[in-house]
UniProtKB/Swiss-Prot annotation:
Enzyme superclass (EC): oxidoreductase
Presence of the UniProt keyword Amino-acid biosynthesis in the record: yes
Purpose: Catalyzes the NADPH-dependent reduction of L-glutamate 5-phosphate into L-glutamate 5-semialdehyde and phosphate. The product spontaneously undergoes cyclization to form 1-pyrroline-5-carboxylate.
SUPFAM superfamilies assigned to the protein according to its UniProt record, in alphabetical order: ALDH-like
Signal peptide stretch: none
Record carries keyword NADP: yes
GO MF, any single term: NADP binding
Name of this protein: Gamma-glutamyl phosphate reductase
A GO cellular component entry from the record: cytoplasm
Length: 423
């Protein structure tokens, strides 16, 4: 297979399909989503059979249990796919909305219309559910998409792509609006991220090594985040019960997500009160604690252990594991300075009853999501009321934070006049 020619052909067809998608009605897009949902329900066994072959090959390669779990299409996973499709269909269609409409002294009205981005390339690892999630969001937002999933999920993705194509055709929409790259050749990714004539934006969903490669090689703009080094700062004017709840949930609700707390900052004025009960809570949940000297002194006196001395590397680390770095800081200024220096601009929270300090934290912490008296785990499209998300961005241009339907659109200016000319 000539990868260069193959990818160029996918891009050309996607660009052509994107024009039809931009003018597609809400009814047609929702009909396509419903048709795909019904096709998954109808062909559930065939999907599981294709997936079983992918899983068998993954086991032969000796891939670990966590990888196999992400790859597997269980009955529950298929049910979640169907529910997700119908949920996206129920969301308001942002395309064509005109907002910020203002009268100008010249007599014209100026506003902004929400429009699709065009062609979106999605690069992700071997999680077949992302094929449906990404296709649904791109379809509803009026975009065409080229999906490049992990090589271990080739048969699963091909089977899903067939059903997506059927759904698009049934709704009178172009099948090329959703195309799945049908090769495991890594050169396909290299081509996709440089096809500026055909692809408007890349959304990578994967590990750090994938994102770093794309940062170095991509010519197409990206919506991405590299790390989720999230902080909770407990102020000396915090409510202790709230602090315990937030710190527990932010770390132990799920360890392997990008919005999990990785560093806990504690004001020196509350450290002796907060750290003993919190340290015992983490110890009981088998969370390894990597602590600075001040935190060690308080925790050791309270009989909490074992403790590991933190190094500078710990403040830079996204563990994605039951490991937590803890530092005692002088106060709000030191906490903000630490977060802006070591953080990844993803999600950070303060626990405090002081309104002025909370507002300062919101203004001065340079992150995509900033929270007061709430767990960092809330940094999620569903929790934010977006309905669904295609990922989270910690960049500052275009989309920032959880990226839902609106994040896959752009704004263009529209002018409504009555024959006016500029004087």
């Amino acid at each position: 297979m000539d990868i260069d020619q193959y990818m160029t052909d996918l891009g050309r067809r996607a660009r052509h399909a994107s024009r039809a998608m931009a003018r597609a009605s809400t009814a047609a897009k929702n009909a396509a989503l419903d048709a795909v949902a019904r096709a998954i329900e109808r062909d559930a066994q065939a999907l599981k059979d294709a997936n079983a072959r992918d899983v068998a090959r993954a086991r032969e390669k000796g891939l670990d249990a966590a990888f196999i779990d992400r790859l597997t299409l269980s009955d529950n996973a298929l049910k979640t796919m169907v529910e997700g499709l119908r949920q996206v269909a129920s969301l308001a269609d942002p395309i064509g909305e005109i907002g910020n409409l203002k009268y100008r002294p010249s007599g014209i009205r100026v506003g902004q219309m929400r429009v699709p981005l065009g062609v979106i390339g999605i690069i992700y690892e071997s999680r077949p559910n992302v094929t449906i999630d990404a296709a649904a969001l791109c379809l509803k937002s009026g975009n065409a998409t080229i999906l490049r999933g992990g090589s271990e999920a080739l048969e699963s993705n091909a089977a899903l792509a067939k059903l997506i194509g059927e759904g698009l055709e049934a709704a009178g929409l172009p099948q090329d609006a959703v195309q799945v790259v049908a090769t495991a050749d890594r050169a396909a990714v290299g081509k996709l991220i440089t096809m500026t004539d055909y692809v408007d934006v890349i959304v990578p969903r994967g590990g750090k090594s994938l994102i770093e490669r794309l940062i170095n090689e991509a010519r197409v703009p990206m919506i991405k985040h590299l790390d989720g080094i999230c902080h909770v700062y407990v102020d000396d004017r915090a409510d202790l019960a709230k602090a315990l709840t937030v710190c527990d949930n932010a770390k132990t609700h799920r360890y392997g997500t990008c919005n999990t707390m990785e560093t806990l900052l504690v004001a020196s004025g509350i450290a002796a009160t907060l750290l003993p009960p919190l340290g015992k809570l983490y110890r009981d949940k088998q969370v390894e604690l990597r602590v600075d000297a001040a935190a060690r002194a308080v925790l050791a006196e309270a009989g909490v252990g074992p403790l590991v001395d933190a190094t500078d590397e710990d403040w830079h680390t996204e563990y994605l594991a039951p490991v937590l770095a803890i530092k005692v800081v002088d106060g709000l200024d030191a906490a903000i300075e630490h977060i802006n220096h070591y953080g990844s601009h993803h999600t950070d929270a303060i626990v405090t009853e002081d309104h002025d300090r909370a507002m300062r934290f919101l203004r001065e912490v340079d992150s995509a999501s900033v929270m007061v008296n709430a767990s960092t785990r809330f940094a999620d499209g569903f929790e934010f009321g977006l309905g669904a998300e295609i990922g989270i961005s910690n960049d500052k241009l275009h989309a920032r934070g959880p990226v839902g339907l609106e994040g896959l659109t752009s704004l263009k200016y529209v002018v409504l006049g009555h024959g006016e000319g500029r004087q």
